[in-house]
UniProtKB/Swiss-Prot annotation:
This is 1-(5-phosphoribosyl)-5-[(5-phosphoribosylamino)methylideneamino] imidazole-4-carboxamide isomerase. Coiled coil: none annotated. GO terms for biological process: L-histidine biosynthetic process. Pathway: Amino-acid biosynthesis; L-histidine biosynthesis; L-histidine from 5-phospho-alpha-D-ribose 1-diphosphate: step 4/9. It comes from Geobacter sulfurreducens (strain ATCC 51573 / DSM 12127 / PCA). Belongs to the HisA/HisF family. NCBIfam families: 1-(5-phosphoribosyl)-5-[(5-phosphoribosylamino)methylideneamino]imidazole-4-carboxamide isomerase (TIGR00007), PRK13585.1 (NF010112). Its EC number is 5.3.1.16.
């Protein structure tokens, strides 16, 4: 299991939202490329980037910042937010993004996931955001009637590289991830699961490591590494040595 720091982009800056609300944002850094370099310096093996403006608009919005991040670091990246079609996926992969995350598009158009996996094997990740176990889309603005487990099962056999599972009730609230829901999802599918939302202490990372055998491949942390609640270098060292 690896620890994956997040860079959430809004108007070209690194921000964190509370529970996905655009009006509840805190700016942590004006220069995303500098922030990416810092996470790489602290030992990150993968960087998670979200184009928040893109997620809400349904089309890419922070391309210049994303390009600057890719040029600034050597570690691989994964990017989500506003990616709804094959040309956008292709453009980002050509830019140097390692893996592209499909969220709302995956829920509304599973055929897109299937086609993208065929065209770009190993480079498509599905993001499933859920509130009380039900899938949320459109930048979390809309909760559907589909369960996270049922949606994830649809992608079995497509060749999806990973599923990022975010419990939006926990995201940005520093309350710890939803371990039980994450484990239930990981055990229901064969696709590796990356946990996200609420990872706010080394203890949370240890708790996720304890269910790693269920199929947990990583933990994304955002707010906690910006506020200092988690020291990224310490978290990376913890996962490398297999626990405390």
């Amino acid at each position: 299991m690896i620890v994956i720091p997040a860079i959430d982009l809004k108007e070209g800056k690194c921000v964190r939202l509370e529970q996905g609300l655009m009006e509840k944002d805190t700016v942590f850094c004006d220069n995303p490329a500098d922030q990416a370099r810092e996470w790489e310096r602290q030992g990150a093996e993968l960087l998670h980037i979200v184009d928040l403006d893109g997620a809400f608009a349904g089309e890419p919005k922070n391309r210049a910042s994303i390009e600057a991040i890719v040029k600034a670091i050597a570690i691989p990246t994964q990017l989500g937010g506003g990616i709804r079609d094959i040309p956008t996926i292709e453009a980002y992969l050509s830019l140097g993004i390692g893996r592209v995350i499909l969220g709302t598009a995956a829920q509304r158009n599973p055929e897109l996931v299937e086609e993208a996996c065929r065209l770009f094997p190993g480079r498509i990740v599905v993001g499933i955001d859920a509130k009380n176990g039900m899938v949320a889309v459109q930048g979390w603005a809309e909760v559907t009637g589909v369960t996270a487990v049922d949606l994830a099962k649809r992608f079995e056999g497509y060749g999806v590289a990973a599923i990022i599972y975010t419990d939006i009730a926990r995201d940005g609230m520093m309350q710890g991830p939803n371990i039980e829901a994450t484990r239930a999802l990981a055990e229901a599918i064969s696709i590796p699961v990356i946990a996200s939302g609420g990872v706010s202490s080394l203890k949370d990372i240890e708790n996720l490591m304890a269910i790693e055998t269920s199929g947990i491949a990583g933990a994304i942390t955002g707010k906690a590494v910006y506020t200092g609640a988690i020291n990224l270098a310490e978290a990376v060292a913890l996962t490398k040595r297999g626990g405390a």
